[in-house]
Every structure is written in structure tokens, then in C-alpha cells.
């Protein structure tokens, strides 16, 4: 377990992770360079997980908010990477707050997890004809548009 990585490594891990989602933000090396600069301020922290070959297999960005340990972003290739990173940051804290997509089902990995649903995203389709043409769909409402997605959304962004 380490607390450092290069911007290119973080981007590569992110791109591998988002393959499992239909909705996500496009990021580049500059995004991660900005993030790494912010981490030097000490408000947020980074923990990484690497496999036996030294390849980055996941990272967590977390911070203390009042008395709570809050994971701001969790990117991982396998559940073991997530488990080990969470164990690393838990330390003497009693609990960790993590926001994930509904499809990630962390309660299967962490049996004592208490899932809570929270709505936090709003979407607007500016041109239904264009949307329907691009996605070969017949959506008339945002709810219908979301229904055509085959993978969950992953929309966590700071910069």
C-alpha cells in the first residue's frame, strides 16, 4: 500500500475502471496533475493499491469531514483492491463513508455496510431528435433515456 502515484498511472487506472460504466467524465493527465497538486495541501489524501508486478490496480481519494472519514473517489479493478485500501485508511476510525453507483453493491463485500440511497444528479437532453439518433433510441423523457443505458453511470468530478 502506498500514498503516491504518477498522473499517468492514475489516468490509466481510471480509464480501465470506467469501462464498466456508460456515463462518466472524460479526464486527461492535466486533471490528475491538478489533483496531485491539491493533495500536497493535505486536505485530501491518496492511497493506492498495486499488484505483485507494481501495476496500479486502484486508488482512493479521501478526507476527514468533521468526525467522518469520507472517500471522495474510489477507483478499483477488483474487490480485493478496494478492501485493502479501505482497511489501510480505516486505522482507528469507526466508519468510512463511501458514495458509489447503485450497481456497485458494496454490501456484498462489506457485510456490515449500511447502504443509503441518495439522489444527486440531474440531466437534461437539449435535443431529443439528436439524442435518439446518436443512441438509436426513442426516448421522450430523461427517465426513458436513462433506461436505455446498459451500464451504470459514474459521475464523480472535482475539476
What do the predicted segments below correspond to?
Residues 1-80:
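Amide-forming acyltransferase catalytic core, primarily the GNAT-like/NAT-type
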Residues 1, 72-159:
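Active-site/acyl-donor-binding loops of N-acyltransferases
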Amino acid at each position: 500500500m502506498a500514498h503516491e502515484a504518477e498522473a499517468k498511472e492514475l489516468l490509466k487506472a481510471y480509464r480501465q475502471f470506467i469501462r464498466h460504466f456508460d456515463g462518466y467524465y472524460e479526464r486527461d493527465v492535466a486533471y490528475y496533475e491538478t489533483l496531485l497538486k491539491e493533495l500536497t495541501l493535505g486536505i485530501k489524501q491518496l492511497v493506492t493499491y498495486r499488484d505483485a508486478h507494481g501495476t496500479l490496480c486502484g486508488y482512493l481519494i479521501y478526507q476527514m469531514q468533521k468526525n467522518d472519514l469520507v472517500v471522495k473517489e474510489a477507483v478499483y479493478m477488483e474487490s480485493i483492491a478496494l478492501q485493502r485500501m479501505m482497511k489501510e485508511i480505516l486505522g482507528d476510525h469507526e466508519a468510512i463513508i463511501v458514495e458509489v453507483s447503485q450497481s456497485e453493491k458494496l454490501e456484498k463485500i462489506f457485510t456490515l455496510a449500511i447502504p443509503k440511497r441518495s439522489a444527486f444528479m440531474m440531466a437534461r437532453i437539449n435535443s431529443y431528435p439528436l439524442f435518439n439518433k446518436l443512441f438509436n433510441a426513442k426516448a421522450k423523457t430523461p427517465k426513458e433515456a436513462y433506461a436505455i443505458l446498459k451500464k451504470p453511470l459514474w459521475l464523480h468530478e472535482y475539476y
